[in-house]
Amino acid sequence: MGRRFKIESSQDHSQTPPRLGLIFNIQRFSIHDGPGIRTTVFFKGCPLRCRWCSNPESWNDYPEIVTNDVKCTKCGRCQPVCPVDAIVVDQEGRKLNRSLCNLCLKCANVCPTGALAVTGQWMTVGEVMKEVEADGLFYQNSGGGVTLSGGDPLRQWEFALELLKDCKEKGIHTAIETSGYAPWEVLAKVLDYTDLALFDIKHMDAARHQWGTGKGNELILDNARRTAAKVRTWLRMPLIPGYNDSEENLKAVARLGLEIGAEKVSLLPYHIWGKSKYGRLGRQYPMEQTPLPSDDLVKRCEKVIADVGLKATIGR
């Protein structure tokens, strides 16, 4: 099960303290983020804004307020502690004006039910390692280990590097899941302590990639080639109906994988498990009109890639 965190005190997030990482979840017994049984550490902060993202709480590199109106008892404790009058509690319930909120987090600290909570906790490498090492026996028996995900761990690369070093010193298999949108100099340092790269490829066309993620793909494709030349690499592609499921794009992804020596492409079918998170963050979900992929579509896409000569798997 994943673990959600709550900030225990207000913190100034304008400057990240040295060797602290901003983590929004640590998921134990994960089987979808690399080989074996793994612990996945989710880093906050991402350079992309993928329209289908199932972890929108990962985008920003600072702690944020998330709401759960069902849990609100209208007790009113949050209103007086807000220094900018961003909260109003009346008979209809609690209202949070995010345009006024200064992210002091005081409201979440006094909320007794979790109707106001914080996503993102500053942690030391030692604190994360305590979670990671708890399942060492499972890693040994299953060929598993730790996976750094997000967001994108490269947004906090110095902390990620220290964490990976610690894992390697303790004989724990390491993997990173990344968008690849970072300077190669940064990625190369992290890869020195990485056994497996789970490298996301959203679309092979630069313009379509820009539309879907907010960024072009030139840097990403260059880094994919360099990454596969350095460490064992799996490509991962979110399968979004009407966006990147064309035969042309699938063949291009497969050819890229063959060119760079990737072991396989993992197809991750679009889902709406993260849809409710958008409302809890005060955002609109942008994919309301996108259908879920049918089993036939997923199998067809898998076959297109396999016919090019690259192994394809579904969901991991």
What does each model-found stretch correspond to?
Residues R51-S58, R77-L96, K106-W122:
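Iron-sulfur cluster-binding cysteine motifs and their immediate structural context
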Residues L22-F24, D90, E177-Y181:
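Short gly/ser/thr-rich secondary-structure transition/capping motifs
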Residues G126-G279:
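Conserved AdoMet/S-adenosylmethionine-binding subsite of the radical SAM
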Residues I23-R77, R94-L103:
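N-terminal pre-triad scaffold of radical SAM enzymes
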Residues G114, D166-K170, V308:
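Conserved dinucleotide-binding and phosphotransfer motif residues
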Residues M1-P35, A228, L239-R316:
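Auxiliary Fe-S-binding modules of radical SAM enzymes
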Residues C50, C72, C82, C101, ...:
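Hydrophobic packing within well-folded, soluble alpha/beta domains
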